[in-house]
Amino acid sequence: MNELIKHKLELLPDSPGCYIHKDKNGTIIYVGKAKNLKNRVRSYFHGSHNTKTELLVSEIEDFEYIVTGSNTEALLLEINLIQENKPKYNIRLKDDKSYPFIKITNEPYPRLLITRQVKKDGGLYFGPYPDSGAATEIKRLLDRLFPFKKCTNPANKVCFYYHLGQCKAHTICQTDQTYWDSLKEDVKNFLNGRDDKIVNELRDKMTKASELMEFERAAEYRDLIEGIGLLRTKQRVMNQDMQDRDIFGYYVDKGWMCVQVFFIRQGKLIQRDVNMFPYYNESEEDFLTYVGQFYQDNRHFIPKEIFIPRNIDETLVKAVVNTKIIKPQRGEKKQLVNLATKNARVSLQQKFDLLEKDIRKTHGAIENIGDLLNIPKPVRIEAFDNSNIQGTSPVAAMVVFVDGKPSKKDYRKFKIKTVIGPDDYASMREVIYRRYSRVMRDGLTPPDLIIIDGGQGQVNVARDVIENKLGLDIPIAGLQKNDKHQTHELLFGDPLEVIPLPRNSEEFFLLQRIQDEVHRFAITFHRQLRGKNTFSSKLNGIAGLGPKRKQLLMKHFKNLPNIQKASLDDIINCGIPKNVAENIQESLREEREKG
C-alpha cells in the first residue's frame, strides 16, 4: 500500500457510493459499490483475502470514489461503470453484455415484462438492475400492486390473476387509454419514491382487514408495505428517449474550484470528469470559462442537453455551447445536479485534507531530520549532483527544497569550467565554491542544510570549500546510493558516520525525493547539453553555416534527426539561404553514407 492510498483511506466518507480501483497506468481494474465507502474500501487493504482478491489488491495503485444519494443509486452506477469501462476484475464476475430492465409495454392492454433490450418502441423502461433476480423481485411486487395485463388471453376471457385482483384487462375497455396512462404514471411515481399514496391505501386496507379479523389478508398488506419499504430508495428511470446529457456541478473553497461533470449516455450515468484549479475572478465567471473550454475543439462530445446549477446564467452557457441548456428546478434532474455538486465538494475537501496531512507529515519529517543531525530545523535544503559520461559535457545541478517542497525558481545549472576529464571531486569543489561565493557576494539566503548526492569523498570536498575556503558554517550531509542506484544511507558528522534511518519513515521518503529530484535535474541538463554539442559538431565545416544560423536550426528543428528528415524547403523556411540549405543536406547525406 503506497502513501497516497494510506492518506486517502483516512479521508473516506461514511456514505454510499462507488469506488474505482486503478493500476499503475491509471487504468480502471475494478469497480465496486458500498453502503459505507469508508468501511468497504478500507477492507481491501486490511486483513486477509482469498487468492483472487489478493491479486486485485496487489495491482491497486490508486482509487477514486463517487458519493451517491443511496445504496440503490450506487448499485446502478456500479453497473453502468462496469459496462462502460469493462474492468478486468469485474469482467470475470460480470461478463453479461446486458442487464435486465422492467418494461411497461406500449400495447392496447399494457403488460409488465423483464427484458434485456431497450428499444425505441414507446415502452417505459426502468433500470438497469444488477441481475434477473433483482428485477424479478421488483416485478413481483409491481404485479401485486398494479393490475396490468398478466397473460396472453383475449380480453374477453378472464385469467388466474384476475381472481387474485392483479389483472384488470378483462374489465377495462381497450379504448380506456386514460386508465392505462394513469397506471403507468403510478408505476413511474412509485419507482421514483413517490409512494406515500399507495402505502397509505395499503395501511387503510390492512387496518380494515384486521378489524374484520381477516388476518391472512392483513398479513399480505403488511408484506406489501414492507416490500415497498425495501424499495423506498429512489430507482432511476430510463425513458425510451435514452437521452445523452452532461450534468455539471461545482464547489469553491479557499481560492480553489472543483468542477464535476457526470456523463449520462443513453439515459445511464457511465462516467465522470473531475477537475480542480485555482480561480481568480468571480466563481460563476470562471465556471462559465471552464464550460466553454470543456467543449472547445471537440475535446468532449456535446450532448443534446447540459444541466447546470441554478445560479449560472444559461444564456451565457448557450453562447459558448450550441445545445439545450437546462437549470433543473426540482425532481430527479435537480437531484443529479445536486449530486455532482456534492461530489465536487467532497473531492475539493479531500484535496485540502490530503494537502494538510502531507504538510503535517513533511514538517514533521523536516523537524526529525534536524533532530537526527542535531541541527536546527532545516527549512531550506540545497542539494547537488554531478553528471558526465566519460568526462564529456560535465555539468552539475542544484535543487532547492523549502518546507519539504521543491522551489523550482531557485534551481540552478552549472557547466563545469575548470575541470578536464571525469573528476567528480574537482567538479564538486568548483560548483560549491561558485554557488556559495555568490551567496556571500550577493547576500542571498543561505541554506539550513546542504545535501551532496555522493559518498564520503564528495562530502569532504564540499565541507573543505564551505569551512576552509569560504569560512561558512553550513551543515553538510551526504546521500549515498546502493549498487542499484537507490537511496541507501545518510552520512553526517565529523568524522562522517551513517545516520540510522528507517526505510519506511517520512524522513527517508523526503530525502529520497530530494536525491531523485537533483539527479533528474542534473541528468536532464547533461542530455540537453550533450545534444547541443552533438548537433553543433555535426554541422561544423559546412560552408555558409555560422553560429547564428546553427542557432536558428537548433531553435526550429530541436535536434539533428529532424534536420536530416527535413526537406530543402523546410530548411529554407526557417531562414537559411537556399545555397546554404543545399550544403547542409549534402553534408548530412555524406555523414550518413560514412556511418
From Swiss-Prot:
InterPro entries (UniProt xref): GIY-YIG_endonuc, GIY-YIG_endonuc_sf, GIY-YIG_UvrC_Cho, RuvA_2-like, UVR_dom, UVR_dom_sf, UvrABC_protein_C, UvrC
Subcellular location: Cytoplasm
Protein keywords: Cytoplasm, DNA damage, DNA excision, DNA repair, Excision nuclease, SOS response
Entries under Pfam families matching the protein: GIY-YIG (PF01541), UVR (PF02151), UvrC_RNaseH (PF22920), UvrC_RNaseH_dom (PF08459)
Biological process according to GO: nucleotide-excision repair; SOS response
Residue ranges of every copy of the GIY-YIG domain listed in the record: 14-91
GO terms of molecular function: DNA binding; excinuclease ABC activity
Cross-referenced Gene3D superfamilies: 5' to 3' exonuclease, C-terminal subdomain, GIY-YIG endonuclease, UVR domain, UvrC, RNAse H endonuclease domain
GO cellular component labels: cytoplasm; excinuclease repair complex
SMART domains: GIYc
PROSITE patterns recorded: GIY_YIG (PS50164), UVR (PS50151), UVRC (PS50165)
Keyword DNA damage recorded: yes
The UVR domain, residue ranges: 196-231
Principal subcellular localisation of the protein: cytoplasm
Disulfide bonds: none
Subunit structure: Interacts with UvrB in an incision complex.
Family: Belongs to the UvrC family.
Function: The UvrABC repair system catalyzes the recognition and processing of DNA lesions. UvrC both incises the 5' and 3' sides of the lesion. The N-terminal half is responsible for the 3' incision and the C-terminal half is responsible for the 5' incision.
Entries under HAMAP family matching the protein: UvrC
Listed name of the protein: UvrABC system protein C
Species whose genome carries this gene: Streptococcus mutans serotype c (strain ATCC 700610 / UA159)
Gene: uvrC
